[in-house]
Amino acid sequence: MSLLRTVELRKRFGALNACDGVNFTVEKGEFLSLVGSNGAGKTTLVNLITAHLEPDSGRILFEDRDITGLSVSQRIKAGIARSFQLVNLFDGLSVFDNVALAIFARDGKTAKIATLAANDDDVRRETREVLAEFGLAAKGELSAGELAQGERKLLDVAVAYALRPNLLFLDEPTSCVSSAEKAQIMDTVSSVVRSGAVTAVVIEHDMDVVFRYSDRIVMMHEGAFLADGPPDAIRANEAVASILLGISSPA
């Protein structure tokens, strides 16, 4: 049984077929990269799966349960979380409190964060564990707004991970950061996936990152899947090379 499966998923925006009968599977424990040129349909597909868009038709099954009609919050509770291309943090709160707030929300705790943080030892302990996993333990008392861009990206992923999903979608986690920060972010995410804690689907444009970290790569083009396979097979695919890498086969 696949962890996630979509069945003939469709979404149009006027004349644009952004998701054209997509049958997509994600297997438990894999690191999957979703690639394609701008406008290929990658973010639309993830938005459909995470309930930020409604499909025109088709079904979404998670752990063999039909979740097509569930809301964003219901899908989070079911075990699906995501981070966005544009970092979504509370800059006025500390790094620690950003993660703690995600844990409070996950557990349905609604009191003021200052009260909860002062009185909930379990949440404080779990927050420290998440920060340590993401290399942010020493930054806990800083405000999120004080972090460097790469650290902000890491914190954004850590906040999504603190929801303890079974499936985590990451939308361009390495955009607008240095090469060293890219490695730090992806090494951390890869380590969490390899530990068995979560399955990850990453939208990524940096093909060096994609080939280095992925177990499987799926390429979208004009709302449909053009290629699906392990890195070596995708690297050797002439259609992929032509569209993504600008490489044409010899005449």
Residue ranges and their predicted role:
Residues 2-251:
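Glycine-rich phosphate-binding loops of nucleotide-dependent enzymes
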